[in-house]
Amino acid sequence: MRAWLVIAVAVLGVRDLAAQAGQAPERTVTSVSFRGNHAIDALTLGAAIATSASSWTYRVPLLKHLGLGQRRLFDELEFRRDVVRLQILYRLHGFFEARVDTSVARTAGTVDVVFRIDEGPPVLVDSIVVRGVDSVLDARRLRGRMPLSEGKPFDRVEFDASADTVATALGNRGYPFASVFRNYTVDRAARTAAADYEAVPGPRARIGDIVVGGNQAVSAKIVGRSLAVRDGDWFSQDALYDSQRSLYQTDLFRYVSVGIAEDSTVAGADSLVRIRVQVNEGPRSRVRAGAGYGTIDCFRAQTTFSTANFLGNGLRLDLAGKVSKLGVGSPTDWGLSNSICSALSGDPFSERINYLASATFTQPAVFGRRSTLTQTDFAERRSEYKAFERNGVGSSLAASFGLGRFSLLTLSYRLTYGSTTADTAVYCVYFDRCEQQAIDVLKERHRQAALSLSLTRNTANSPIEPTAGSVVSVELSHASPLVGSERLISYNKAVAEGSWYWQLERGWVVALRLRGGVIRPGVAFVVDTSIRFVPPEERFYAGGPASVRGFGRNEMGPLVYVADTVLVDSATGANEPVNLRISPVGSYAIGLANFELRMPSPVWGSRLRLAAFVDAGELWDQTAAGLIPSGLKVTPGVGLRVGTPLGPVRLDVAYNDYPRQRGPLYEVIRTSSGAPQELRLVQSDYPGPPRGTAFFQRLQFQFSVGEAY
């Protein structure tokens, strides 16, 4: 009778609260904040309660009346429940003595809510005992892998996850039916907790047979090649996950499930289990098309046709076509270099559209489950901003081998036949003099072949906006007549790059990148002149939105200046070039370091992010005496990122206090008809056009899509 009376009083109390809430005037929640929280961040606390602030766009009158904001009303009953929700959340995380107080500032139509939290001392894990695994696992090492650890707050989520860790470890040792019973005791007075796990491994089992279902055009043999398990193997839960991942990576299936079949034992034998692979095939063919805009591409478009299981045996065919420089390059020169594509004005390598047409054949599981063989045939015209234009056809063959879960080893061979055109003045730098006959030889079509070996390890948690993990790669390349290249194009090249990401707290990320590379050319003879020639497309360039952001694209390294006319100041004797253009030469070695702190914006934090960064870089030129450094350059800056489905749209502003790069100044000598005939060296160490001294004149703006690294 007493119990029914208590329930009745509680129900009537809730009804009275609900009635009061219904009679109260509507008030808009303008802000919700937390004070005193340290163990749990505000974002997690906010997700655990019902009361939330209206969007900032709703609080701006103009945007509010345009219907862009979202209004959230204050609910008195839910607000009181939020106090209980927060107390329960803290108990789950080991803070049994946490207290929550509230402060509400009310006006006629709005409320501002503050939750004041006194977390109190946590209950700490005093001991963790794991029983039943001594004959199978090392209990001490197992405890080190468990999320719950001694000396830390007793977190119920980590307590449950630790039981899953024990079960998974047993499953990977061949025990598919392992059970883990868990219990804990809490001493509130001593503020300690003891966790106890009792494992029952069950029988150890091997794979009896593998059944594939749901496949239609793709044969069971092709499915089997991607599996990490075989008949007779000891059962492993990780191997099942790995098999599922490998099948998805083939691009043949839209759904894959790999697990123990319902009739999990084979012929009633506990020591054998049946694995069922259930798949749902994806579309046989896909067509994708897209268009976009970039500051150094102007308008661009691309289309891809892919067909899976081409000619059977799991082979995939990808046909791709890409074009860029639309609107500025012939035959689509619509005069946009004078308006929205003004960055390309004066770039001689943007006068024709760039294109790529390619056909790629990909065969998975050729040399093993984690291997892929890829052949690509292509024709292209591509250019690097103010540096060069490449025209050619070619083919590449690459064999990739997965090493563990995160690493990939690739051996590739690339053979091309084409020409690379750079500014004539750049070739003059190569020869240390301007001989048209020798320059014409370098501009001719040449056969270029390179053998490359690369190793990549990727543990980043996102390919678009990583917040943890790293991406490290090393690539070695060799080109010489030994592998099919012409003698003119002979070099050894090594490049290493690493990016690391750490999350300081929710939304705050530190990103670091280091990159280094060196290329050593062989000796060739051109018109009886000894030269160490490296094709412009193989050289190192720095400066731009993904490099040292205080410099324009490719403008940090050695430069060549070319003017239509060079006047001489009668008073100072200084050269005054007319219609000056700048051409990057490229370098033989590079060293880059980028440090960036990424943080949420105080307004519209779900879409806007801020960044503060420091970029540093140095390039080395090759001389007879060896590599000569150009000097370390360091440029700090800040940035704004706007989140989009394709990745963040990025605007960076960097400060550059360095004078312009010094380099040779050439004047174009023309014939009587006005056609360019040759170049004349005017000054071997021209300091470049003067840079403004005002603060804003030393700012370099960079606009791009996607993080810098």
Please describe what each predicted stretch is.
Residues G346-D440:
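Transmembrane beta-barrel wall of Gram-negative outer-membrane proteins
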Residues Q20-F299, T304, D318-L336, L344-Y355, ...:
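Periplasmic polypeptide-binding modules associated with outer-membrane biogenesis and secretion
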Residues W4-L12:
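Sec-dependent N-terminal signal peptides
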Residues V273-R274, R286-R288, G292-F299, S306, ...:
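C-terminal outer-membrane beta-barrel translocator/porin domains of Gram-negative envelope proteins
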Residues K633-Y658:
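A short, conserved beta-to-alpha structural element at the edge of catalytic cores
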Residues L148, V212, V229, Q249, ...:
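Conserved helix-loop functional segments at active or binding sites
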Residues R254-V256, S285-V287, C298, F310-L317, ...:
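Repeated loop/turn-to-beta-strand initiation elements of outer-membrane beta-barrel proteins
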Residues R15-A19:
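Sec/Tat signal peptide C-region and signal peptidase I cleavage site
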